[in-house]
Regions:
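A Lys-centered signature of the CheY-like receiver
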Residues: 135
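Receiver (REC) domain active-site loop signature in two-component systems and cognate sites
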Residues: 83
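Acidic catalytic/metal-coordinating carboxylates
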Residues: 60-61, 87-93
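Non-catalytic signal-transmission and effector/linker regions of two-component phosphorelay proteins
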Residues: 1-32, 42-45, 98, 128, ...
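Acidic, metal-coordinating helix/loop segments flanking the phosphotransfer/catalytic sites
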Residues: 58-76
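Active-site residues of response regulator receiver
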Residues: 35, 80
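Alpha4 helix (beta4-alpha4-beta5 surface) of REC/receiver domains from two-component response regulators
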Residues: 90-94, 101, 110-132
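Two-component/phosphorelay signaling modules centered on CheY-like receiver
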Residues: 38-57
Length: 148
């Protein structure tokens, strides 16, 4: 019988700035991705890579992301709403309590009403919501939200 090795709850995604779109002295914008789906994290990473210089850190669960917030100090948080253990709304509330004041992009396969309610809640607790999108997110939607 083979033993199953536990999988880490996070992985770091180094980003190489696209020299054609970034000024040479521009520091990469720090982004924290939070989604319990590895495929979605990879898809978001690939899109961000096309948009410019980003220092991306990805987390598969909200509790690990909360621990990473002060260390990574992201400018932008891209967050799923439907996750096990701690959902995106609980995560956003905890992030606000920790003092996170960066921009937020919400992504979810949940219905529009849930995304709209989450957007209003995030704004009510002082977060800057740059967008709320249905999964899978279109690249152009994400580009506009990231650039605002």
């Amino acid at each position: 019988m083979a033993l199953v090795q536990p999988q880490p709850s996070f992985f770091y995604i180094p980003m190489t700035p696209d020299s054609s779109s970034a000024s040479p002295d521009a520091a990469p914008q720090r982004v924290l991705l939070l989604d319990d789906d590895r495929f979605m994290l990879a898809m978001l990473r690939d899109m961000l890579e096309d948009f410019g210089p980003f220092d991306v850190h990805a987390e598969l669960d909200a509790r690990s992301a909360l621990a990473e917030l002060p260390r990574h100090a992201p400018h932008l948080l891209i967050c799923d709403l439907a996750m096990p253990d701690m959902d995106g709304i609980e995560f956003l509330q905890a992030a606000a309590v920790q003092g996170f004041r960066g921009r937020v992009i919400l992504v979810s396969a949940l219905e529009d009403g849930v995304r709209n309610a989450a957007t209003e809640l995030a704004r009510a607790i002082g977060l800057q919501v740059a967008g709320a999108f249905r999964k899978p997110v279109a690249a152009e939607q994400l580009r506009r939200a990231v650039q605002c």
